[in-house]
Amino acid sequence: EIGVRLVGSEMCIRDRYDYIADVFDTLIVRDIRKKYKIRNTQLMDRIVDFLMDNVSNLSSARNITNTLGSMQEKIHHTTVGNYMQYLCNAFAFYKVRRYDIKGKKYLSSNDKYYLSDHTFRYAKLGTKNMDYGRILENIVAIELLRRGYEVYVGILYKKEIDFVAVKRSEKIYIQVSDNISEEKTFEREVAPLLQIKDAYPKYCLLYTSPSPRDG
């Protein structure tokens, strides 16, 4: 289990998650509601759940509006965008923009949002149907930000490089994967890195689960 360690080891897992969820709701969400005088608290909660369930996925205020708007009364993408910005201002989530490596320009739509600590996700949404590849990507994003890098999602010839991390004259490219056991998967993950023509370091970070030794 990776994440914040806020409670004593004598507490059961469910109690820990209840405590962590309460910390998130009390210290972050409720403070945001009060600071920005948010009336539609249900919408805020739905946006939080959506972003938690879609860490490492491309998201925008419009596609979130379309998703949530189909479930309840009509909502406006400007309101959703404001609520997303409030969550980022409170450091609950971090927005990472897309960057066209060849064109050397930022792309104006579909950013990625990373959760400040994915233990909040466990606590509020549980572990069912969790994509560990996206969780690993979230961990890498937060660690890069913690180390002082400016972080972007790289786009090159319509292919994605998970991270372009820049700090002063330093630049690194990173692909993250939880499984490259199949050749097609390996080629898909590595191909974008091989197409980058500069001399900056390029890494592929993998999660490998331990396997029992034969015999």
Indicate residue ranges for each PLM-predicted region:
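Hydrophobic/aromatic beta-strand patches that form the interior of the parallel beta-sheet core
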Residues: 114, 174, 203-205
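Alpha-helix C-cap/termination motif
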Residues: 5, 147, 166, 196-199, ...
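Catalytic cores of nucleic-acid endonucleases
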Residues: 154, 178-209, 213
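Structural motif
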Residues: 170-172
